[in-house]
Design a protein with these regions (language model features):
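Glycosyltransferase specificity loop/lid
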Residues: 1-180, 185-195
Length: 195
């Protein structure tokens, strides 16, 4: 598969779920698409974008033609840049508050399109970012949900309801298992606590 001719270059907006284990696979996919001739806009939350710039340096995201980073707010109040965000709060906030900033970003990208930046032609978003489906419908562009965790994780997610209905989860006696694991860990790595 070769590169896409310049005249019909598609512009994909890639939106990962704002956790490292979701950002990295999406970034790899975005780089592959860019290598094949796509114009890529990679969307991070403001919080994660600041952390990325701080860890890699202010110019670390420069230098790739047709590959740009944009940000949207996650809807959470500002927090310490060195502290991980509360995942349940982040999940609720991004699903409730993500649609408007995303639509504003797509409008901005489309209104400022030029010969060097084509209008947005598609969205690839994390499977956990389903609000992007509404944005894609509003702009009349396709949206692909990309599942970033492992296939085993995907199967667990897809069949979780059935596992609960059959009584297979939550696992019976899981508290006892966790306590045993903690005791073994302490015995091996911190035996002084057992004295």
């Amino acid at each position: 598969m070769g590169s896409i001719p310049e005249a019909i270059k598609p512009h994909v907006v890639c939106i990962p779920y704002p956790l490292q284990g979701h950002i990295n696979p999406m970034l790899k996919l975005a780089k592959l698409l860019h290598h094949k001739g796509f114009y890529v806009t990679f969307v991070n939350t403001e919080y994660n974008h600041k952390r990325l710039l701080r860890s890699r340096g202010p110019n670390s995201l420069d230098g790739l033609p047709d590959f740009h980073f944009e940000t949207i707010p996650d809807g959470l109040p500002p927090s310490d840049a060195d502290v991980s965000q509360d995942i349940p709060s982040l999940s609720v906030s991004i699903s409730k508050n993500g649609i408007l900033p995303l639509c504003n970003l797509i409008s901005k990208l489309n209104n400022t399109s030029s010969w060097d930046r084509p209008p947005v032609t598609s969205i690839i978003s994390d499977g956990c970012m389903s609000f992007t489906l509404d944005a894609a419908e509003k702009f009349g562009i396709p949206n692909v949900l990309f599942w970033t965790p492992s296939s085993c994780g995907f199967l667990g997610y897809m069949h979780y309801r059935h596992l609960v209905e059959r009584g297979l989860t939550p696992l019976k006696g899981i508290i006892i298992i966790i306590i045993i694991i903690i005791i073994i860990y302490i015995y091996i790595y911190c035996p002084c606590y057992l004295l």
